[in-house]
């Protein structure tokens, strides 16, 4: 009887573990009315970035899924569908057409189309579908929302992200997608100078259609961003966001007492080097962050016929590493008047941003795991700016240095001014309303100033102490394009012909000062000698 009870308990435990274990979900997605497979359907674990697309036969395989997860199926022109994962990990999903989505206008390259007429792999994300919360950089609005688009970031406040569409994998060339904002291709994928609150929609071009429109620049896909425009109704909106950040978990390392014990057992000759403090270096280099954002926007018509939107953003973002910070001030303007019964339309967009950020060396987290927990953060008698440092006969060693001192004494800042804008004019010919002539001109200009400073009291492994350096860079991107677009329906046949010309120029320059300190002012009293200092983690084998 006892053996039977134990066996029953074992079966129940096994069932429980299986229920919560991650599984692989397989299935097929079909069109409900015809039963035909649907290729390119986005399959996403809701609330995560774990997603795939169906293949040409409508099949998909999605790993790391557990019971209770919700799978979100999305396809242009079809109603979204959610499926809750239970015990069945082999799915047969039917999607039905949505007349509302079929008529939705999406931006593709130099023009627009409806979902039902789109032929390439295009995915459109509007404001209602974007990621919510305290979003600092624009690309995070679509993080986890588009299958095949992978966005990773370093975690530093305001840091740029690495964006990959369908896993670009060139060894030598860039794998970054092309970013187009209101018709203007911009340089790089750094979007931290854009106010996320200004963005109205994203269109992601994933296949050869991107190359057909933008040439080799679109080889890694294209992300088209459309910003919010003015309207006839007057409105004034204010949005305030505050966010609190904390890193709850810590790496389990020896505290001061355990460290003294292990040194006494393994390195008794080094006992005299230990201190009397009990310092948790992880707590010292990590901080609880408070971040705030202010967004003010005004909409309405100027002079009764120019729909206008003006927005201002102020962001102060703290990082969770000591000294890490990101500040941004942003102003954007959009004007969209029309004339001659909407035959002539003008769209003007302009964005201006000031960014000031201080970088914190993330490597000091590793230093916090290795540094001696028996030593204090500060030492009033220390010649190194009042911070404790390991010395032997007055000499700083080549081992790990005080991570708090490294963060506070080394100040690396970056100040950037960026402005970009675009003017587009569309004219629908009166004598041939099926044809529209368009011309646009835009620019993207960036000026960056980076500085590095550390005092003479910073320990060094060379005979050069301290740092005072500066680097500047400037870039200018200019773009002009003109198109003629003819659209007409002949019965069931729709004709859409586009011809155009595009001109783009890039200019960049930069300079760096190197260390500007006078070599004769360098102190050499504390030159280093090679000594290895080790902080043993608890996983160190006994």
Q: Where in the sequence are the language-model features?
A:
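Flexible glycine-rich, low-complexity coil/linker segments exposed to the extracellular/periplasmic environment
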Residues: 253-282, 373-406, 479, 483-485, ...
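Flexible loop and strand-edge segments within Gram-negative outer membrane beta-barrel domains
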Residues: 247-249, 279-281, 289-313, 317-324, ...
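Short, small/polar-rich motifs associated with maturation and membrane association
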Residues: 1-339, 344-351, 420-421
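Extended hydrophobic secondary-structure segments that form protein cores and membrane-embedded regions
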Residues: 180, 239, 347-351, 437-445, ...
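Residue-level preference for non-acidic, small/hydrophobic
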Residues: 238, 310, 423, 484, ...
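Charge-patterned, long linear interaction tracts outside catalytic cores
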Residues: 412-441
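Short, solvent-exposed loop/turn and secondary-structure capping segments
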Residues: 104-105, 117-118, 359, 449-452, ...
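Aromatic-anchored glycine-rich loop motif in surface-exposed flexible loops
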Residues: 450-460, 514-528
């Amino acid at each position: 009887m006892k053996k039977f009870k134990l066996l029953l308990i074992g079966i129940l435990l096994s069932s429980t573990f299986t229920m919560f274990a991650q599984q692989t979900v397989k299935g097929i997605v079909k069109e409900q009315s015809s039963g035909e497979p649907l290729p390119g359907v986005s399959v996403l674990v809701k609330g995560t970035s774990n997603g795939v697309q169906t293949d040409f036969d409508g099949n998909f395989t999605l790993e790391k899924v557990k019971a209770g997860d919700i799978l979100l199926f999305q396809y242009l022109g079809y109603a979204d569908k959610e499926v809750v994962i239970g015990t069945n990990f082999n799915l047969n999903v039917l999607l039905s057409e949505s007349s509302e989505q079929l008529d939705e206008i999406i931006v593709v390259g130099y023009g627009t189309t409806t979902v039902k007429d789109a032929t390439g792999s295009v995915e459109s994300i509007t404001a209602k579908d974007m990621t919510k919360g305290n979003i600092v950089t624009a690309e995070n609005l679509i993080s986890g929302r588009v299958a095949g688009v992978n966005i990773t970031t370093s975690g530093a406040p305001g840091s740029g992200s690495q964006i990959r569409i369908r896993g670009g994998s060139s060894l030598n060339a860039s794998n970054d997608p092309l970013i187009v904002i209101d018709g203007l291709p911009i340089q790089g994928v750094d979007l931290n100078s854009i106010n996320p609150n200004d963005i109205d929609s994203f269109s992601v071009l994933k296949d050869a259609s991107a190359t057909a429109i933008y040439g080799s620049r679109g080889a890694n896909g294209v992300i088209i961003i459309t910003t919010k425009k003015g309207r006839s109704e007057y409105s004034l909106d204010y949005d305030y966001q505050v966010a609190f950040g904390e890193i709850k978990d810590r790496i389990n390392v020896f505290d001061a007492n355990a460290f003294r014990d292990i040194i006494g057992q393994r390195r008794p000759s080094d006992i005299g080097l230990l201190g009397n403090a009990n310092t948790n270096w992880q707590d010292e280099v990590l901080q609880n962050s408070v971040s705030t954002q202010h967004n003010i926007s005004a909409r309405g018509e100027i002079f009764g016929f120019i729909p206008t939107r003006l927005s201002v953003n102020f962001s102060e973002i703290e990082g969770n590493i000591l000294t890490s910070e990101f500040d941004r001030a942003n102003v954007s303007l959009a004007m969209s008047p029309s004339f001659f019964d909407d035959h002539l339309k003008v769209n003007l967009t302009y964005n201006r941003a000031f960014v000031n950020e201080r970088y914190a060396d993330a490597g000091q987290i590793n230093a916090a795991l290795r540094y001696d927990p028996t030593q204090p953060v500060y030492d009033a008698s220390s010649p190194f700016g009042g911070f404790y440092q390991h010395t032997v006969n007055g000499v700083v060693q080549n081992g790990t240095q005080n991570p708090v001192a490294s963060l506070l004494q080394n100040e690396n800042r970056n100040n950037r001014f960026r402005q970009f804008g675009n003017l587009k004019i569309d004219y629908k010919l009166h004598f041939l309303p099926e044809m529209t002539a368009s011309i646009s001109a835009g620019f993207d200009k960036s000026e960056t100033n980076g500085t590095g400073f550390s005092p003479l009291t910073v320990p060094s492994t060379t005979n050069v102490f301290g740092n005072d350096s500066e680097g500047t860079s400037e870039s200018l991107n200019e773009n002009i394009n003109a198109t003629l677009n003819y659209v007409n329906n002949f019965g069931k046949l729709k004709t859409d012909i586009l011809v155009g010309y595009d001109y783009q120029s890039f200019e960049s320059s930069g300079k760096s000062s190197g260390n500007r300190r006078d070599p004769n002012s360098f102190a050499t009293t504390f030159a280093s000698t090679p000594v290895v200092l080790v902080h043993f983690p608890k996983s160190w084998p006994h």
